[in-house]
Amino acid sequence: MGRRVFEVFCVLACLAVSVYGLAQEGHPLTGTWSGDWGPTGTQRNHVTLVMNWDGKNVTGMINPGPDAIPLASVFLDVTNWTVRIEADAKDPSGSPVHISAEGKLDDIGSYHRKITGTWRQGAAKGDFRVTRD
């Protein structure tokens, strides 16, 4: 009987530790985010953001792949859950283009949280919506 109680205790302890580990999500911006941005509801550009918390800063890229754009800075204001993202890219002719996005982080308690706001890329301005995958 004592051995059986010990085995049950060990199983429950292992389950408790594994559930606690799953609950740890880390920084609220960490992950892959996908969505779109554009000046109108019909003129949209697909965008993927990959963001990681390195212990001091949020780093990452826009549209990972051969033409990936490194994020210059990411700022999260936890008092009102606003996000500011800055990056520098090049247009098709090779000229520099500044990208800035400012938005609000919503559905904080959900894994599939969202950021919505304003996207500026060079002279173009529109809204954006991304959801964490």
Where are these regions (language model features)?
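Sec/Tat signal peptide C-region and signal peptidase I cleavage site
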Residues: 19-23
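Central antiparallel beta-sheet cores of small beta-barrel/beta-sandwich binding domains
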Residues: 24-133
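Bacterial N-terminal signal peptides that target proteins for export
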Residues: 1-10
